UniProtKB/Swiss-Prot annotation:
Broad EC category: ligase
Subunit architecture: Monomer. Part of the FGAM synthase complex composed of 1 PurL, 1 PurQ and 2 PurS subunits.
Binding residues for Mg(2+) 2: D115, D266
Purpose of the protein: Part of the phosphoribosylformylglycinamidine synthase complex involved in the purines biosynthetic pathway. Catalyzes the ATP-dependent conversion of formylglycinamide ribonucleotide (FGAR) and glutamine to yield formylglycinamidine ribonucleotide (FGAM) and glutamate. The FGAM synthase complex is composed of three subunits. PurQ produces an ammonia molecule by converting glutamine to glutamate. PurL transfers the ammonia molecule to FGAR to form FGAM in an ATP-dependent manner.
Major subcellular location class: cytoplasm
Keyword DNA damage: no
Annotated source species: Jannaschia sp. (strain CCS1)
Protein name according to UniProt: Phosphoribosylformylglycinamidine synthase subunit PurL
Length: 719
């Protein structure tokens, strides 16, 4: 088949700027052919190259005594002791999920699972952070149903528990939903597999499902804004098969145990192109591929299509040649394709042969480590300090408004569609703060959470970035876990706009400061830019996934409030209402500055919770909705009423940071008061547990009525 002639329209469709296309010509000393241009386009787009963000990502703290592998591999790796490690990452699948919600979300789950088991880890937990447009928008209902069904359909069939996540709604996501998928797995520290190729003349092997035309150009699509041609992009969305992925997992882990693997990489964005280039570049080698050997499921596929297909459930491996027969037998047993499709070469070349013709001959390093990198112009965000006065409200009426909001009501309708008990090690399920999974066969457990408050980030990117990390830290602490490390998923608009780039730079600064202060280095992550439709961008959404360790199940804080318990508030309360849930849901306002984060207080207060866990009955952190919403959540979980002593609006609904609400016995409360005094931690009695109502000052409502609103609001809207 004759390749298309390169035209200006084709160059533009591949996402090249004039300068970038000129640079390609300069590198080659000639114009690229169609296949070569597709390869350069895939590797130089934002999704694969991080060309607009690399400069700033390098400033993040990525090291620590617990870190085995930081950013740059398929996933981050953190030591959890006893010769074991946790492997984890969060990644976006935003653009595909908006175009084709079910498959976009499903393949997002599949892709992040492969990132984990490619490293030699068996997946043990999944989470997702989902952002949708306003409820009344005509597309929101379809997106919610499709995405939730896609996440559940893939994860449930694969057999990994989905143990937590977030769901939010805001008009800024009307034209771009966000689907951020997280996965974690367990591995032995001496059995980790990396992607860098080594050895000249080693066979390059294709593993897994066959290649089709689905997803061709997906990475390029994910690096561009949406416009009125969005429906034309549907063929760029991948199609997933979770049962094939399950077989691929088992075959891959069995293959690794055989000793046949030199290096291995999953095929994700840009498919065969990106996996081969990354393996060669990291190993300082070239790669020659023979596409005639690639297993295909569609007739007459071109070299361009095979190189850029993003068909799912595929891996690429550099194999020990003497164990080829052993490796082939394993994959044939699992009814998966196994094909030697190339070899490593000493030259810095990426050579593609198809039907006996050389379809591409490119300098491999120019596609990866020496790809373009930009220092985009940026302007700092001017923090929004001005805020109109906030009227006093009836606290129960305001609380009821929050409980009915899709942003703060129960997500039961969502997580009931996810299997969160498969594998039998789930200790704390969705809806109870951080998810907790036992390390199988041990007395240890791992806690997982994902957090961000986009309103804060828009108002003040630095403080919003800090707060995302701090809230993740608090969620882990509230279940008794010691926070270990984080992964970031940076979702932003068009980086060519200085104000958007300024949001990104500010958020990175805040995240870096918080991770450094809280000893939670960033070990993996993902950047998703150009989340805009017709020039309108999303709220800046730097999602933080975090992992914590419970060295013993005795460390777990998993109790509930009981009749007669005292309520204690840890941390300073100053009544910060700027950018609060109260303003957004009750007054339809988003004004004022984001709450500022005292990282020293976060560390002290978190250490206090963990050091005194034996005195704590129930614990939750304070975030959206402040003390009032936290108190309701404690009451709802216990099925027992609560009386709060305070009654003014700012104290009840302010969102000051570094705070926890504790329920415990009177004697334990006295012991905690003494310990807090010694530690220099603010601690105050704010109420008591008992009865069947929620009482706040002079306002009161039956807990059963409030719980019904909270429990049913989401399903009433979306079921």
């Amino acid at each position: 088949m004759t390749e298309p002639t390169i035209t200006d329209d084709i160059i533009k469709a591949h996402g090249f700027t004039d300068d970038e296309y000129a640079e390609v010509n300069k590198i080659l000393g000639r114009a690229p052919n169609y296949t070569e241009m597709g390869i350069f386009s895939a590797m130089w787009n934002e999704h694969c190259s991080y060309k607009s963000s690399k400069k700033w990502l390098r400033t993040l703290p990525t090291e620590g005594p617990q870190v085995i592998c930081g950013p740059g591999e398929n996933a981050g790796i953190v030591d959890i002791g006893d010769g074991q490690c946790v492997v984890f990452k969060m990644e976006s699948h935003n653009h595909p999920s908006y175009i084709e919600p079910y498959q976009g979300a499903a393949t997002g789950v599949g892709g992040i699972l492969r990132d984990v088991f490619t490293m030699g880890a068996r997946p043990i937990a999944a989470m997702n952070s989902l952002s949708f447009g306003e409820v009344a928008h005509p597309k929101t209902r379809q997106l919610v149903h499709g995405v939730v069904e896609g996440v559940g359909g893939y994860g449930n069939c694969f057999g990994v528990p989905t143990i937590g996540g977030e769901v939010r709604f805001h008009p800024a996501y009307n034209g771009n939903c966000l689907v951020n998928a997280f996965a974690a797995g367990l591995a032995d520290t001496d059995k980790i597999f990396y992607s860098a190729a080594s050895g000249v003349g080693m066979p390059v092997v294709y593993l897994g499902a066959k290649t089709g035309r689905d997803g061709v150009g997906g990475a390029t699509m994910a690096s561009a804004e949406f416009d009125d041609t969005i429906e034309e992009k549907r063929p760029t969305v991948q199609v997933g098969d979770p049962f094939t992925e399950k077989r691929l997992l088992e075959a891959t882990l069995e293959l690794m145990a055989s000793g046949a693997v030199i290096s291995i990489q999953d095929m994700g964005a840009a498919g065969l192109t990106c996996s081969a280039v990354e393996m060669g570049d990291k190993g300082g080698l070239g790669i020659r591929l023979n596409l005639d050997a690639v297993p295909i499921r569609e007739d007459a596929m071109t070299a361009y299509e095979m190189m850029l297909s993003e068909s799912q459930e595929r891996m690429l491996m550099v194999l020990k040649p003497e164990l080829e027969d052993t490796a082939r037998a394993i994959f044939e047993k699992w009814d998966l394709d196994f094909a030697v499709v190339g070899e490593t070469i000493p030259e810095d070349r990426f050579v593609i042969v198809h039907n006996g013709e050389t379809k591409a001959d490119l300098p491999l390093s120019k596609l990866a480590s020496t790809a373009p990198e930009y220092d985009r112009p940026w302007v700092p965000t001017d923090p929004a300090h001005d805020m109109d006065a906030v009227p006093e409200v009836d606290p129960i009426d305001a609380l009821r408004a929050l409980l009915f909001s899709p942003n703060y009501c129960s997500r039961q309708w969502v997580y009931q569609q996810y299997d969160h008990q498969v594998m039998g090690d789930t200790v704390m399920s969705p809806g109870l703060g951080a998810g907790v999974v036992r390390v199988h066969g041990t007395d240890k457990a791992l806690a997982f959470t994902s957090d961000v408050t986009p309103r804060y980030v828009k108002a003040n990117p630095v403080e919003g970035g800090k707060q995302a990390v701090a809230e993740a830290y608090r969620n882990l602490t509230a279940v008794g876990a010691k926070p270990l490390a984080t992964t970031d998923n940076m979702n932003f608009g068009n980086p060519e706009k200085p104000e958007i780039m300024g949001q990104f730079v500010g958020a990175i600064k805040g995240i870096g400061e918080a991770c450094l202060a809280l000893d939670t280095p960033i070990v993996s992550g993902n950047v998703s830019l150009y989340n805009e439709t017709d020039g309108t961008g999303i709220l800046p959404t730097p999602t933080i996934g975090a992992v914590g360790l419970l060295s013993s199940m005795d460390d777990l804080i998993a109790g509930t409030a009981r009749d007669g318990h005292v309520l204690l508030l840890v941390g300073d309360t100053n009544g910060h209402l700027g950018q609060s849930a109260l303003l957004a849901e009750v007054f339809n306002r988003e004004d004022g500055d984001a709450p500022h984060v005292d990282l020293g207080a976060e560390k002290r207060n978190g250490d206090f919770i963990r050091d005194n866990r034996d005195w704590i009955g129930a614990c939750t952190d304070l975030s959206d909705g402040g003390l009032a919403l936290a108190a309701f959540e404690v009451a709802h979980a216990a099925g027992c009423g609560i009386t709060l002593d305070v009654g003014d609006t700012a104290t009840l609904f302010g969102e000051d940071q570094a705070r926890y609400l504790i329920s415990t016995s009177f004697d334990a409360a006295e012991a905690l008061m003494v310990a807090a005094g010694r530690a220099g931690v603010p601690l105050a009695t704010v109420g008591k547990v008992g009865g069947a109502s929620l009482r706040i000052g002079t306002s009161e409502a039956p807990l059963a009525d409030l719980s019904a609103t909270y429990t049913n609001a989401f399903s009433q809207t979306f079921a």
